[in-house]
């Protein structure tokens, strides 16, 4: 029998062939030969993930053991699973994998050698192994030789849970076991589950080392200045950080340590619904041989791609290594950020397109994490809905929100970063009536903030939200900056703004131990 690479130590015995860290071309060949996908006209591997075209947050669990019981914030996001249930589920999963070919990726999460974690991902499908090969940090030959994983993901979409036996909610499951340093995934082919489960692990482990883990993108200017972009799925993190005038560090997950910031990943996972070469040339050009397209419409004859088609899902995705973006920062490490941007997709159409935040307002809005759940990023979401996701990443935060807010607040104060709130959502009315914010205008506002061009501009407090709105911005018409001016019916705007202010206040009641100066930094409710 060939090298099993220590899989028997996990409890995986009698596998078929084992393929470890295959090069991209071989993984693409094998995925095609196994009927897992097709080659699109631009060379990317195009796959479909079945009925699960987004994350399935209701199907994610954490094993409740004494070592983590008091440090995990249990609830609807972090659902507990008994240890015995995990072991029984894992035994059946291991039995299912006997005799099947397995694909192993050994690599790292974390670009900074001081904080990176060696990981292993074991896949049933070649295309998913290509995905993790492109998304995580790839090892050198010497690093691979010495690799000893500290956390393992086993992903077998073909294996399904039995809810009444396993204690799950459906046939799909994502279970994190911190004691076993093991994640098991089954019943869903959506590759984002692997990425986000490892992100959750980092969000649990890094605060103990004084590192602030963040759901954000990051880039670097010509002078080495760095900027962060926080926001939930679909708010513009990937799009706005892929700026031809700046160098991309990473598009989704970073840590902020005493030394600066670092990317957790080695790749990008971009939404590509309505992708255009005109508006997002860097992402457009990154989708080529070696990239993976998830649930994107591809003509069966010509293999031409239709990025506008949402027949399978709004949540169409492209995965590619960060070095497919020209001039990306490799390794993904930068200095302390000078600018922090909170992105929100406001479905009510009443938030300003850009506003400056005081330190207290920054903490209020970070804890609130207001945005809209955009169609397709989770199962069951077909129209935008107002939502509050603490720290712009509640689905991935195992600990209390205060842990992450305190870490970020300390970093912002210590390094004097300017914080802006940017609305990439609707203007001139709520979703369905108003229009989506112009991407060129948003880019112009973000560039002005990062370059310091708003520092000398007059700011006026928003009468409802209290945040500081600039009266002018290079490249943006003045009337766009004041959301009330974009509505035909000003009374309807006022009513909608009051409604959203009330939702902010209602949501913030759950933070009982927050200092009064932060609580007072929220919208004025009349």
Swiss-Prot record:
It catalyses: oxaloacetate + ATP = phosphoenolpyruvate + ADP + CO2. Pathway: Carbohydrate biosynthesis; gluconeogenesis. Its EC number is 4.1.1.49. The keyword Cell cycle does not apply. One of its GO terms (molecular function) is metal ion binding. Its main location: cytoplasm. Mn(2+) binds at residues 196, 215, 252. Keywords: ATP-binding, Cytoplasm, Decarboxylase, Gluconeogenesis, Lyase, Manganese, Metal-binding, Nucleotide-binding. Its cofactor is Mn(2+). It comes from the Bacteria. Substrate binds at residues 55, 190, 196, 317. GO terms for cellular component: cytosol. Binds 1 Mn(2+) ion per subunit. ATP binds at residues 196, 215, 231-239, 280, 317, 442. InterPro entries: PEP_carboxykinase_ATP, PEP_carboxykinase_C, PEP_carboxykinase_N, PEPCK_ATP_CS. Belongs to the phosphoenolpyruvate carboxykinase (ATP) family. Involved in the gluconeogenesis. Catalyzes the conversion of oxaloacetate (OAA) to phosphoenolpyruvate (PEP) through direct phosphoryl transfer between the nucleoside triphosphate and OAA. NCBIfam families: pckA, PRK09344.1-2, PRK09344.1-3. This is Phosphoenolpyruvate carboxykinase (ATP) 2. The gene is pckA2.
């Amino acid at each position: 029998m060939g090298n099993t690479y220590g899989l028997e130590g996990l409890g995986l015995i009698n596998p078929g062939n084992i393929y470890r860290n295959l090069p991209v071309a071989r993984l693409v060949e094998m995925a095609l030969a196994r009927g897992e996908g097709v080659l699109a006209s631009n060379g990317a591997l195009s796959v479909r993930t079945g009925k699960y075209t987004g994350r399935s947050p209701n199907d994610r669990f954490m094993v409740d053991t004494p070592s983590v019981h008091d440090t995990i914030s249990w609830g609807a996001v972090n659902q507990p699973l008994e240890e015995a249930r995990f072991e029984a589920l894992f035994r059946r999963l291991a039995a299912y994998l006997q005799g099947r070919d397995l694909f192993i990726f050994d690599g790292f999460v974390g670009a900074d050698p001081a904080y990176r974690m060696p990981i292993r991902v074991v896949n049933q499908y070649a295309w998913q192994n290509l995905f993790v090969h492109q998304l995580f940090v790839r090892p050198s030959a010497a690093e691979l030789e010495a690799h000893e994983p500290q956390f393992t993901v086993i992903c077998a979409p073909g294996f399904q849970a039995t809810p009444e036996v396993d204690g799950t909610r459906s046939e799909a499951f994502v279970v994190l076991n911190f004691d076993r340093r093991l994640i098991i995934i089954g019943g869903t082919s959506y590759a984002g589950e692997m990425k986000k489960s490892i992100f959750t692990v980092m969000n649990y482990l890094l605060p103990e080392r004084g590192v602030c883990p963040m759901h954000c993108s990051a880039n670097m200017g010509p002078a080495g200045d760095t900027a962060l972009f926080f926001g939930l799925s679909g708010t513009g993190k990937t799009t706005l950080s892929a700026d031809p005038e700046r160098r991309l560090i990473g598009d989704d997950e970073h840590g902020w340590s005493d030394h600066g910031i670092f990317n957790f990943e080695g790749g990008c996972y971009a939404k590509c619904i309505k992708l255009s070469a005109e508006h997002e040339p860097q992402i457009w050009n990154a989708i080529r041989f070696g990239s993976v397209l998830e649930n994107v419409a591809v003509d069966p004859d010509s293999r031409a791609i239709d990025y506008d088609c949402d027949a399978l899902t709004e949540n169409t995705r492209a995965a590619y290594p960060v070095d497919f973006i020209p001039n990306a920062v490799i390794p993904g490490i930068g200095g302390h950020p000078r600018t922090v941007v909170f992105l929100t997709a406001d479905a009510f159409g009443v938030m300003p397109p850009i506003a400056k935040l005081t330190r207290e307002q920054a903490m209020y809005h970070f804890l609130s994490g207001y945005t809209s759940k955009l169609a397709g990023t989770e199962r069951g979401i077909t129209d935008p809905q107002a939502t509050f996701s603490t720290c712009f990443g509640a689905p991935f935060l195992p600990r209390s929100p205060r842990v992450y807010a305190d870490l970020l607040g300390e970093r912002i104060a210590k390094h004097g970063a300017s914080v802006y709130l940017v609305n990439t959502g609707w203007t001139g009315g709520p979703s369905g009536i108003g229009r989506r914010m112009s991407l060129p205008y948003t880019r112009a506002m973000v560039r002005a903030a990062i370059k310091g061009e708003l520092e000398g501009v007059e700011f006026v407090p928003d009468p409802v939200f209290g945040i500081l709105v600039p009266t002018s911005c290079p490249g943006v018409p003045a009337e766009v900056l004041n959301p009330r001016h974009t509505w035909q019916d000003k009374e309807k705007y006022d009513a909608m703004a009051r409604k959203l202010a009330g939702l902010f206040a209602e949501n913030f009641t759950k933070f009982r131990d927050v200092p009064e100066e932060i609580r007072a930094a929220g919208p004025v409710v009349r």
